[in-house]
Amino acid sequence: DPAAADPTAAEPSADNSPADGARDEAQRVWDVVVVGAGPAGASAAYAAAVAGRRVLLLEKAELPRYKTCGGGIIGPSRDALPPGFELPFRDKVHAVTFSNNGRFTRTRRSKQMLFGLINRPEFDQQLVEHAQKAGAELRTGVTVQRVEQHGSAVPDRRTVAVVLQGGETILARAVVGADGSASRIGAHVGVKLDQVDLGLEAEIPVPETVAEDWKGRVLIDWGPMPGSYGWVFPKGDTLTVGVISARGEGAATKRYLEDFVGRLGLAGFEPSISSGHLTRCRADDSPLSRGRVLVCGDAAGLLEPWTREGISFALRSGRLAGEWAVRIAEAHDAVDARRQALNYAFAIKAGLGVEMSVGKRMLTAFERRPGLFHAALTGLRPAWNAFKEITQGATSLGELVRGRPMAQRALAALDPRPERGAGTGPAERETGAAERETDTGGEATS
């Protein structure tokens, strides 16, 4: 197959037979259609386009658009960006103030930058522009109603139909769902959730004197509800102030944000934006594909369960989804497509899945003993060094716990249950799951 041998050769379709090529051109069958132009979707579109495939990126909003997000860019996020990407930092963090529900405040500092802070509209827009420069085509203001893998809209078993609001149908050899935590593509795949949290956030413009006090420093406050915490992220003349806690604690979460803002002395400043957002974390056995459809980022429930950090998970899973979508687009039958989808699941679970597994244990331990976490980060150099290494990208939470006996013992003492992989069970179980995902292709709506 010349297309497989030369991934830089852009073709109308992954199938190079003359008859199919002419038909594809007439019906405009895309190699890869990506739904959602956030960090996960833009990364997937970039990865597929840079491989020479014909890629369409769909986004329901007009860009740029606001997203509820702290906007912290840690090392793993930076390392997953396209070559030449210049981060639009609003601030660079060298100090962290920790507090335990407003008490026992202590600030720790680092000579090297810990992480950077961005505004999502700028960041997302730049990611999309990189995907476009790589060859992806963007359509905004379109809403996907459903995807179909058989039926009258689908010309053959190698094609997926993406049905838009209004009835237009787009055909593709592979589809990547990156349409966020309320994903319609996720519903089609059958994504199952294990943890749902509510994040509330306010963008608060402040005078220059207040902004100067926060420059280069963030605040992390361990909250009053189990597993909750708050943050202040400075971005020039605006402070991003937010809190997050388990869903079902809506009134208490709102009260926490109000108390938090009041304690900070910011109650007198009017927010320019107040917003809320649900973060959703996948169950261990949640599928990552169905037929020729993959999911990534929030649509797949991929985020770090303890901190609920999602940007690095979106960028990394999006890149993998784009790379494996290219292989699925090239697959000539269901068996090969199934094999490629299974490989994508293995790639996700071997990396991000391990981090999620450790993150779940960290969250359980944090829910029980937030004061101990606070004491460690503010009083023990190894704990602070671990925080620095993770945020700077020198290691990950999974690598840290698995590679350092002291960290293993500490986590085992806090959470004595045996470690479970985030869906990294026996290969036989995964193969069976992949077969079910592939063989039950069809239509789902939400």
Question: Regions from the language model: what does each represent?
Answer:
Residues A51, H130-P271, G301:
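Predominantly flavin-linked oxidoreductase catalytic cores and closely associated redox partners
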Residues S77-Q126:
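A conserved beta-strand/loop capping segment in the N-terminal third of enzymes
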Residues R146, T169, G248-W324, E330, ...:
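FAD/FMN-dependent oxidoreductases across multiple families
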Residues D1-Q27, H150-R157, A331-A334, R420-A444:
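Intrinsically disordered, low-complexity terminal tails and inter-domain linkers enriched
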Residues V326-E430, E435-S446:
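C-terminal helical "tail/cap" subdomain of flavin- and related membrane-associated enzymes
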Residues A61-G84:
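Conserved N-terminal glycine-rich FAD pyrophosphate-binding loop of Rossmann-like flavoproteins
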Residues V33, A37, Y46-C69:
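Glycine-rich FAD pyrophosphate-binding loop
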Residues D24-A40:
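Beta1/beta-strand and adjacent pyrophosphate-binding region of the FAD-binding site
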